[in-house]
Amino acid sequence: MRYLPLTPEDRADMLGVIGAETIDALFVDVPAVAYRKDPVDLPFHAGELEVEREMLALSRRNRSASEGPFFVGAGAYRHHVPATVDHIIQRSEFLTSYTPYQPEIAQGTLQVLFEFQTQVAALTGMEVANASLYDGSTATAEAVMMATRVTRRGKAVLSGGVHPHYVGTVETLAHAAGVATERLKAAIDAEDAVIAAIDADTACVVVQTPNVFGTATDVSKIAAAAQAAGALLIVVTTEAVSYGLLKSPGEMGADIVVAEGQSIGNGLNFGGPYVGLFACKEKYVRQAPGRLCGETVDADGRRGFVLTLSTREQHIRRDKATSNICTNSGLCALAFSIHMSLLGEKGLRQLALVNHHKAVKLRDALAAVPGVEVLTPRFFNEFAIKVPGNAAELVETLAANGVIGGVPFSRLDPGAGLDNVLLVAATETTPDSDIALFSKALSKVLAPKGSNQ
């Protein structure tokens, strides 16, 4: 079929119907500084081969996480993903953007979502989980919005241990929704400050464990304080593998649990897509965002799966919707579920133990470097260290020596005044030889000038 563009007469008729004189009148709301009327001066188009060469040249400027010692975490973690995961998710039945509106032709997809929800509920220690959200940060923002609906209050208290990017996402959505946010000062252990900030206007308290500094915390006291004030406790986790070793948020009294599920079944990538985990107490389920898959029986009594709750604007009136989450995280949720099924309960615990043991080895190696101070007392697979001078400059120097040595906290929160704090992580993909190389490189970089190190 040929593409037949609109004629000048067609455009004139359409503008006449809406009462506009010119096409430019349609863009009066766009600020003049952002509205470009002249054509963009782009280079002449290239062929497929030339474009491929150009993209390869650009990609060579990047450095893969597998190209050398790599200790980056801070919310996204390098883990081994079995080849089985990618093989299964590429089946045509799964590799689709189709939303399972019609259960009679989507039982496979619906069963996978049901199993995913079951796994997430078990991991988080909660009663019910939804069928995934975009990622951990947007799941956190959705949880805050949900808490304001449940409590009919308008303020969220955000712990100083919550990842700054998550805080930024919450603040963006909260501002648009008219919800006040109280962001506490960044702190390795923020329990006392969080409890002190709770008042009669607080809809929810948002805490993270392990937090952005790696601190693994029992949030039971915060849960008791929040609930005594009529607020909900939202617990955030950025490293889902930690569920295999640490006490679940549900056991500690959480009302809502959100997490980034990238660590299980999904590789590192810049910009996503990742998969947000969302679970809550059953009494709040009708205020939960996204979709929820349920089990039922058909007319012949056979077991089947359907979308039980879909409080999103594609399914119900926009003013009644609690979220506009769509299907883009479904494939990532499937990858999560496949990897979890391959691991099993014992496998996940073993994986978590390996991660912790690797981090302990890293902690011991770095603590022996003169000038380095380990700041995180209790951790899973990530911790913070204090270094002499500027951590961002140190990371650049380490990179020049072949080691990607973590994330400077100042890169996450430039205004926190923690320019000498470096976040480092180790997983099952970190060989002992890389830990030794990191320790050696750090000793060399921090050694006084003129020394023999």
UniProtKB/Swiss-Prot annotation:
Catalysed reactions, semicolon-separated: N(6)-[(R)-lipoyl]-L-lysyl-[glycine-cleavage complex H protein] + glycine + H(+) = N(6)-[(R)-S(8)-aminomethyldihydrolipoyl]-L-lysyl-[glycine-cleavage complex H protein] + CO2
Enzyme class: oxidoreductase
GO molecular function, one term: glycine dehydrogenase (decarboxylating) activity
Natural source organism: Caulobacter sp. (strain K31)
Pfam families noted in UniProt: GDC-P
Sequence similarity: Belongs to the GcvP family. N-terminal subunit subfamily.
Encoding gene (name): gcvPA
Enzyme Commission code: 1.4.4.2
Self-association state and partner proteins as the record states: The glycine cleavage system is composed of four proteins: P, T, L and H. In this organism, the P 'protein' is a heterodimer of two subunits.
Keyword Glycosyltransferase: no
Keywords from the UniProt entry: Oxidoreductase
Membrane-spanning ranges: none
Keyword Oxidoreductase: yes
InterPro entries: GcvPA, GDC-P_N, PyrdxlP-dep_Trfase, PyrdxlP-dep_Trfase_major, PyrdxlP-dep_Trfase_small
GO process annotations (BP): glycine decarboxylation via glycine cleavage system; nucleoside metabolic process
Protein name: Probable glycine dehydrogenase (decarboxylating) subunit 1
Function recorded in the entry: The glycine cleavage system catalyzes the degradation of glycine. The P protein binds the alpha-amino group of glycine through its pyridoxal phosphate cofactor; CO(2) is released and the remaining methylamine moiety is then transferred to the lipoamide cofactor of the H protein.
